[in-house]
Regions:
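Short, highly charged, low-complexity non-transmembrane loops/tails of multi-pass membrane proteins
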Residues: 212-226
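Membrane-interface interhelical connector segments
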Residues: 93-118
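Internal alpha-helical transmembrane segments of multi-pass membrane proteins
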Residues: 144-163
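Structural signature of hydrophobic alpha-helical transmembrane segments
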Residues: 45-54
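Pore-lining and gate-forming transmembrane alpha-helices of multi-pass membrane transport proteins
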Residues: 157, 185-198
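N-terminal membrane topogenic signal
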Residues: 4-20
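Alpha-helical transmembrane segments of multi-pass membrane proteins
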Residues: 22-37
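Transmembrane alpha-helix/helix-exit interface in multi-pass inner-membrane proteins
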Residues: 84-102, 123, 127, 131
Length: 226
């Protein structure tokens, strides 16, 4: 149940959580420019560098939605969207600025940070749809079935959100650009990896949510709504 709005005290931890969310998102977007494989040359799984940190944005998104509600979570998600777009626009401008006479890394800069707008659209569309769905589904499950079974809210929202994110991102960016087998490999591997990580980190997510509620002066299962 939401905390009454009688107090004007601002949220104590929301700013720190928001910064962590946006930072993980931006780092993941840059790391995602490299694809790598796990396995042998004949039997392998394909990931991108974003797989290391990006799933944590869904866990933080769960924390935001569970403790602060959909409205505040949505604001942080939009902040991440704006920051990602601004980063892409900055890299695009810098990429086409004339390099200094003694600057020898123009091709390397373009290869790593150079903007391909198809990739930008894929990333932003997948991120926005996935994160908003993740937050909405978690709050919807809570309202529909009550505050019990937090694990079901966390996993259920991730299943829906990551599906939208992964399918949109992979389809826009890679469909028709790689063999169909590699496309399926990349899409399915990325999706199940992210969902599995949510499950594995449940023992961490639970105490984190409880700790943030204590910081905000909330009782168990209360939502910060001030």
């Amino acid at each position: 149940s939401p905390v009454p709005s009688g107090s004007a005290r601002p949220a104590r931890a929301l700013d720190i959580i928001s910064v962590a969310f946006v930072a993980l998102l931006l780092i993941s977007n840059i790391a995602a420019t490299k694809a790598f494989m796990v396995g042998s040359s004949t039997h392998y799984l394909i990931f991108d560098g974003g797989a290391i940190l990006f799933p944590l944005t869904y866990i933080i998104g769960d924390v935001l939605s569970e403790v602060y509600g959909f409205a505040r979570a949505r604001r942080v998600i939009v902040m991440g969207f704006v920051a990602s777009f601004l980063a892409s626009l900055t890299f695009f401008i810098v990429q086409y600025l004339p390099p200094a006479p003694d600057y020898e890394n123009q091709e390397a800069f373009a290869a790593v940070l150079g903007v391909v707008w198809r990739a930008v659209v894929a990333s932003l569309a997948g991120y926005l749809a996935g994160q908003l769905l993740n937050s909405y589904v978690l709050v919807w499950i809570r309202r529909r079935w009550g505050t019990k079974h937090l694990w079901a809210r966390l996993i259920g929202s991730t299943i829906v959100g990551e599906a939208a994110d992964t399918i949109l991102f992979c389809t826009i960016l890679f469909y028709g650009q790689m063999t169909f087998g590699n496309f399926v490999n990349y899409t399915v591997t990325g999706y199940f990896y992210k969902v599995l990580l949510e499950v594995v980190l449940l023992p961490v997510t639970y105490p984190v949510i409880a700790a943030i509620r204590r910081v905000e002066g909330l009782k168990k299962d209360e939502v910060f709504d001030r």
